[in-house]
Amino acid sequence: HRHLKFSSSFGDKMVINRYNNGTLVFQGNPAYILSQAMYFMALMPDISEEEITQRQKDIYRVSTNSVSQARAELKARIPNAYDKLDDTILKILSPAISLSQSNLNVEEYSCYVFPVLKALEALLLNLLNQKGISVNPPKQNLGSVFVPGQPQHVLSSTNQAKVNDTTYQKCLEDIYDYFKKQRHTRFHANQVLVLTTLIFNKAEADAIISDVLKIIDDTAKKIM
């Protein structure tokens, strides 16, 4: 079986065992690191949304929506984007939406904010890639695409020429503005996001989710 160990700068430790029969077993008492684990699982093609949802129920001891219910809610909240998004992005968003709608009562709510911001990052990378703009960490990060040192982020002249579409360009800049604002407030500025400010208020966490979903849907309506 696969044996994965995670640790964080906050002292959290967690072990995930993935057995040959498909069973996932979590060991440890993590805090924010669970959010990274949920995101990691969403990227794994052999781990289903049903498995992720079940692990959420086990870990947080809450009743969450089924995958079909979460997907229906997601489709209702991003009607313009739902059918246009890469399925991996939907797989990241769906469990986070389900958890946000549960009766979750924890000390800290990064468990579903982290995945939705990673989904927004994934969308931005996809949109850049469609215009032939690549970001290759660790030498490059998203900031390398934009003019440095500006209060509002503007694509570099080279990348503006590649995009050659003012509406598309504005969408890229708006996404990065929001993403960087949240990243600097919530996360470390590296390509792999790490929390530096925890989220202790559920309403604040839910507001971030609503913001991200609105940005995604508005972007889809304009350029996807």
Regions found by a protein language model. Give the residues of each.
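Amphipathic N-proximal alpha-helical interface segments
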Residues: 11-13, 17-18, 23
